[in-house]
């Protein structure tokens, strides 16, 4: 490839978020009804667009020029890409492109003021993918499988038709957010969709060198780690925190599946393991929170006047399921686990997920991922056995139960003083972690309090000697500070503490 033709050096995780059975596509309608079509045709196509968050009046058309279309076709034919046309037209057909698109969707019109109708970027839609590159099978989930095309540096996720539309819409919304985050704030930590096929039920994403799980394994095998690698890890997770905050607050999207397996990385080289790119991906569980303006959105594929396909955001996309929130129970913040234990709060909530709750969940899970990097990637060499961030699932049959929730909270209380710093830069009154006695007062039933106390005492007896052997290198101090902030008991500190957003001089140069 020529230098200008090289697509970004990117990978999707082979195990990133297996497709879940909870997805429901009943809200999708493959084609608009006659009444809907008549209403859209009678609606002023520019009315209300300027004030809509996705509106871009300077780029009102989705059709590219014949010259640009021909250039795109020649570029992709050069690299062995072909596809059948979505519909017949006189100009040269358009082929999928593997660089990040300049836009994913644009406002077309508004229907009844609360139903935005968007036009999807036609360049993202293809009928069939043909690449002169031998794919590598990367993994299989419940409803799909992933293949990596190493030379083209793309990952193709082929999905079951029952969940395809839901994840496609999630990816469309998050990808437009990825582009906006880069343009407005320089945030580049959100995976962007490169293409999709309605016919073959495929999603195209960039391919990355590895996910964070693999990075932890590689890091744990290193005998020595340069200080700048540790500081880089702190920078990377601050970038990811900003990306999740942008998704939640600006796009109205809560990820709900933040974990090491869904954080994808590029490294400078496999010898140094210095991270050059880190992004959050896998939109299987994304939920629209109370800040979303797209809960009733319609996406049209093809010519806006005569769309080939119509995608509708399903009604349950913005309905919070507490069972879904708890799907990764050991990643959840204390307030969510306490709601589950006490049967209060979100357990009785049936509306749209509050934005502040969604952000608190995502950031806490991100902090747990960073804690995993520290414990399993950086400390194994100094301890006789590995220290994990949670109790092992196999004791509980890999299912969340009130006893596992109590066990998890007790384990965190005992582990935290050995890992998290007692103070942080510029905050003399900072309390880095919650103690078992304080947490015990927030458990409503006496019987459950006794269980929690038993777990805490047990871990103090069985694990204190192991934890006392932990020595945090000075170069890891910034990473432990970030962990402390993201995993703080106070959800407001998680999202708004100045160290997360202000100058990062306190970390030191990388």
UniProtKB/Swiss-Prot annotation:
Top-level taxon: Viruses
Gene Ontology CC, one term: host cell nucleus
Protein name, as recorded: Serine/threonine-protein kinase UL13 homolog
Keyword Nucleotide-binding: yes
Subcellular location: Virion tegument; Host nucleus
InterPro entries noted in UniProt: Kinase-like_dom_sf (IPR011009), Prot_kinase_dom (IPR000719), Ser/Thr_kinase_AS (IPR008271)
Catalytic activity: L-seryl-[protein] + ATP = O-phospho-L-seryl-[protein] + ADP + H(+); L-threonyl-[protein] + ATP = O-phospho-L-threonyl-[protein] + ADP + H(+)
Keyword Amino-acid biosynthesis among record annotations: no
Record-annotated active site: 257
Membership in a protein family: Belongs to the protein kinase superfamily. Ser/Thr protein kinase family.
GO function terms (MF aspect): ATP binding; protein serine kinase activity; protein serine/threonine kinase activity
């Amino acid at each position: 490839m020529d230098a200008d033709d090289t697509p970004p050096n990117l990978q999707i995780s082979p195990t990133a978020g297996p497709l879940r059975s909870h997805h429901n596509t009943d809200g999708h309608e493959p084609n608009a009804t006659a009444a809907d079509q008549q209403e859209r045709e009678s609606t002023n196509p520019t009315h209300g667009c300027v004030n809509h968050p996705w509106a871009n009046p300077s780029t009102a058309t989705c059709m590219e020029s014949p010259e640009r279309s021909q250039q795109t076709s020649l570029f992709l034919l050069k690299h062995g890409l072909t596809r059948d046309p979505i519909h017949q037209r006189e100009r040269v057909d358009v082929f999928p492109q593997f660089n990040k698109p300049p836009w994913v969707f644009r406002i077309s019109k508004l229907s009844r003021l609360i139903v935005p109708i968007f036009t999807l970027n036609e360049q993202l839609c293809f009928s069939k993918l043909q690449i002169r590159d031998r794919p590598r099978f990367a993994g299989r989930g419940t409803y799909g499988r992933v293949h990596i095309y190493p030379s083209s540096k793309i990952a193709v996720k082929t999905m079951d038709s029952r969940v395809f539309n839901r994840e496609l819409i999630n990816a469309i919304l998050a990808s437009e957010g990825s582009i906006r985050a880069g343009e407005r704030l320089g945030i580049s930590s959100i995976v962007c969709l490169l293409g999709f096929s309605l016919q073959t039920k495929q999603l195209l994403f960039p391919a990355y060198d590895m996910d964070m799980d693999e990075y932890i394994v590689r890091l744990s095998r290193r005998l020595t780690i340069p200080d700048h690698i540790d500081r880089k890890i702190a920078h990377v997770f601050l970038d990811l925190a900003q990306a999740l905050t942008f998704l939640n607050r600006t796009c109205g999207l809560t990820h709900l599946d933040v974990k090491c397996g869904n954080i994808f990385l590029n490294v400078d080289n496999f010898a140094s393991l210095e991270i050059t790119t880190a992004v959050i991906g896998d939109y299987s569980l994304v939920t629209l929170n109370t800040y979303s303006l797209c809960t009733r959105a319609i996406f049209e594929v093809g010519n806006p006047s005569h769309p080939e396909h119509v995608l509708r955001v399903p009604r349950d996309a913005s309905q919070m399921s507490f069972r879904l929130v708890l799907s990764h129970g050991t990643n959840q913040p204390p307030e969510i686990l306490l709601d589950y234990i006490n049967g209060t709060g979100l357990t009785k909530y049936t509306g749209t997920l509050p934005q502040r709750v969604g952000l608190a969940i995502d950031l806490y899970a991100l902090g747990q991922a960073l804690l995993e990097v520290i414990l399993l990637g950086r400390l194994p060499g100094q301890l006789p056995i590995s220290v994990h961030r949670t109790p092992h699932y196999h004791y509980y049959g890999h299912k969340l139960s009130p006893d596992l929730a109590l066990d998890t909270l007790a384990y965190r209380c005992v582990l935290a003083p050995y890992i998290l710093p007692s103070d942080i830069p510029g905050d003399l009154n900072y309390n880095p972690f919650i103690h078992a006695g304080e947490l015990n007062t927030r458990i409503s039933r006496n019987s459950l309090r006794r269980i929690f106390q038993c777990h805490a005492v047990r871990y103090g007896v069985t694990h204190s000697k192991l934890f006392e052997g932990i020595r945090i290198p000075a170069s890891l101090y910034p990473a432990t500070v970030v962990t402390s902030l993201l995993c703080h008991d106070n959800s407001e500190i998680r999202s708004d503490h100045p160290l997360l957003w202000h100058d990062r001089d306190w970390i030191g140069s990388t």
